Amino acid sequence: MDWQKNLLLAAIAAVILMLFIRWNHFQEQLPQHQAGNTPAGSSIAAIAPDSNGDIPSAVPTASDTPQATADSSKVELIQVKTDNLLVTINPLGGDIASVSLPRHFAKLNTPDEPFVLLDNRNNHTYVSQSGLIGTNGTDTAQGRPLFNSSSTSYELKEGSDGLVVDLTLQQGAVNITKRFSFKRGDYLIGVEYLIDNQAETPWSAQLYGQIKRDSQNFVKVSALEMNPYLGAAITTSEENYKKIHFEDIAKQTFETSRQGGWVAMVQHYFISAWIPDASSQVNYKLRKLGDQDLYLLGFTTQPVVVEPGSKGVIKASFYAGPKDTERLEEISPYLDLTVDYGWLWWIAKPLFAFLKFIHGFLGNWGLAIIGLTLSVKLLFFPLSAASYRSMAKMRKLQPKLLELKERYGEDRQKFSQEMMKLYKTEQVNPFGGCLPLLIQMPVFIALYWVLMESVELRHAPFFGWIEDLSRMDPYFVLPIIYGATMWIMQKLNPQPTDPMQARIMNMLPFVFTFMFLWFPAGLVLYWVTNNLLSIAQQYVITRQIERADSKA
């Protein structure tokens, strides 16, 4: 039995160590440059054409569109406010220069300071660009068009479900409107080019959309922490979800073509993504911009032709917001995979769905975790009961095992043979206490990923001192309770016959308590609840067996 227990402990220790490392990897820290919504005329930089070619290449342009020659820093930016988004649009090119999320705080204790997702200040570049290239394209390496707008401030009014922001441009006899569409309660922005061709010749151009970002990670980390993943992701014909790190893009440009799809910039809890029209054939390209620390993740459509006297529409969508699984799944196939639950996603997704279902009734994510733990415990009740019965029988055999240990202590081979005979005589399965616990480990690992990746748990309070279930317990109360419950469970289990193993077992509650100090409070809450339920179940089963033996 000792070697089997060692095997179980080694497996659990390996899982705990792996999760500890991954928790350090995903532990969210606060960005150093967070800021709220940017008013017009603020210090945010207007985006001028880059000399190293941030505009995608296309066929040579024949556009007679007036190109911006004014000082780009003096361009008055356009502010857009909805219930979910605070957006700054630069009329020079019509790019999205910044996005803040008022429903998600930059810090737990600053609800008036929205989380800044896209930004272009403080030596940091993260913007969303779009334009027209090709024969009659308005965007070239020599300049970007300067759009006109009827206002520099737009706000979604009470009682209104949508907001439209139009930027206009005159290209000879062609009227071009760049339209941004916003919906109440949504983070998806519609981007359309409305072409009214009053010229005598066909008009042709290609739509491009791209995310331009540096590789800087403004996450604070301690000696015990690692940075969360920050990088590109894309769906291809070969892979539904493919991560591409900055260093990989720096080594080699990534290109692919497909119908529809998406390309995204992924970070912990949030993403930005370009989603072309699902019916369009699209070329995707991820590249580094010259020798600069700037990366471009974008797409280019096939040429769109608008005949003389006709009108045309070229459209795409841009998402900037939280990793909301249900919403991302609605927007585009496989975009929800940016909520990365790891290789056990097939367990994690229904777990989260059930957790969300319970939260709908209880209204508190901590109580929902307790409810989920109870449900999982009931699901595995037969396995747990079999495990605890096996442990109770093993505990009864402890005096006989100690007697064998004293008799054959120097002859380990003989001791093992006699021990197996004893198990057979008493009809005890030495694996009975281990395998049921190992079978439950995938559920624990999947739940770990759910708690790590679900933005719903970011800044979600429990009770009292726990104000954020996605972060560590600030006063270490739950880890200490966990250690105490683990110690009690050990006392209910059969003790190792080897003194060294017994000392190691006695140290494990302290070791795991120390490791759990940096785990998210929600995960430790799950383990504390699970341990308390296990103690109660094991105590009842052990007493039932002892009473049955006393009657016999």
Curated annotation (Swiss-Prot):
Keyword Cell membrane: yes
GO cellular component, as recorded: plasma membrane
TM ranges: 6-26, 365-387, 431-451, 472-492, 508-528
CDD domains in alphabetical order: 5TM_YidC_Alb3, EcYidC-like_peri
Subcellular location: Cell inner membrane
Main localisation: membrane
InterPro entries noted in UniProt: Membr_insert_YidC, Membr_insert_YidC_N, YidC/ALB3/OXA1/COX18, YidC/Oxa/ALB_C, YidC_ALB_C, YidC_periplasmic_sf
Membrane disposition: Multi-pass membrane protein
Alphabetically ordered keywords of this record: Cell inner membrane, Cell membrane, Chaperone, Membrane, Protein transport, Transmembrane, Transmembrane helix, Transport
Molecular function GO labels: membrane insertase activity
Chain spans, region Disordered: 32-70
GO biological process per UniProt: protein insertion into membrane; protein transport
Biased composition (Polar residues): 32-41, 60-70
Summary of the function given for this chain in its UniProt record: Required for the insertion and/or proper folding and/or complex formation of integral membrane proteins into the membrane. Involved in integration of membrane proteins that insert both dependently and independently of the Sec translocase complex, as well as at least some lipoproteins. Aids folding of multispanning membrane proteins.
Family: Belongs to the OXA1/ALB3/YidC family. Type 1 subfamily.
Subunit structure: Interacts with the Sec translocase complex via SecD. Specifically interacts with transmembrane segments of nascent integral membrane proteins during membrane integration.
Protein name (database record): Membrane protein insertase YidC
Species: Cellvibrio japonicus (strain Ueda107)
Lineage: Bacteria, Pseudomonadati, Pseudomonadota, Gammaproteobacteria, Cellvibrionales
